[in-house]
Design a protein with these regions (language model features):
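Residue-level signal for short segments within beta-strands and strand-turn junctions
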Residues: 48, 61-63, 113-115
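Buried hydrophobic-core signal for structured, non-transmembrane domains
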Residues: 42-47, 96-99
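Extended, low-complexity, turn-rich repeat/linker tracts enriched in Gly/Pro/Ser/Thr and Asp/Glu
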Residues: 48-56, 103-107
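Short, solvent-exposed loop/turn segments enriched in Ser/Thr/Gly
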Residues: 37-43, 91-93
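Intrinsically disordered, low-complexity Pro/Gly/Ser/Thr-rich segments with frequent PxxP/GP/PP motifs
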Residues: 65-96
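C-terminal interaction-tip segments
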Residues: 1-37, 101-117
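Short, surface-exposed beta-strand/strand-loop-strand elements in extracellular ectodomains
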Residues: 51-73
Length: 117
């Protein structure tokens, strides 16, 4: 099914996804290939919950087996927050927003998005 024409929207559902970030690329938001929806990502915050050590984060848009970096190995200082998204963008059908950390259990993510159909 094709993604909806966002001029003729029927439903907009606000959502929030949360995730402890690991050292393997893992999706925080996935728009399945035949969803009939488009996802509007409004905010992505990465918190370093380790009180001592800095940690790096990589965020990518994964499309058709290819990772397109939004941020690549950006340092998140201990006890700090990184605001990754400065302006909203869309995840089309088949797209995922993935996160990878340099150290497991140091970083957590909160992502606010809308499912549009």
């Amino acid at each position: 099914m094709a993604a909806p024409n966002i001029v003729n929207v029927v439903t907009i559902t606000g959502k929030t996804a949360v995730q402890a970030i690991t050292t393997s690329a893992t999706a925080i938001v996935t728009n399945s290939a035949a969803s009939g929806k488009v996802f509007k990502v409004n905010a992505l915050y990465i918190s370093n919950v380790d009180g001592t050590n800095n940690a790096d984060v990589t965020v990518d848009l994964f499309r058709s087996s290819t990772a397109y970096r939004i941020v690549n190995t950006v340092v998140v200082p201990a006890d700090a927050v990184l605001d990754v998204i400065s302006k909203s963008f869309y995840l089309e059908e088949g797209d995922s927003l993935r996160l990878t950390a340099s150290a497991a259990s140091d970083l957590e993510a909160v992502c606010s998005y809308e499912e549009i159909s």
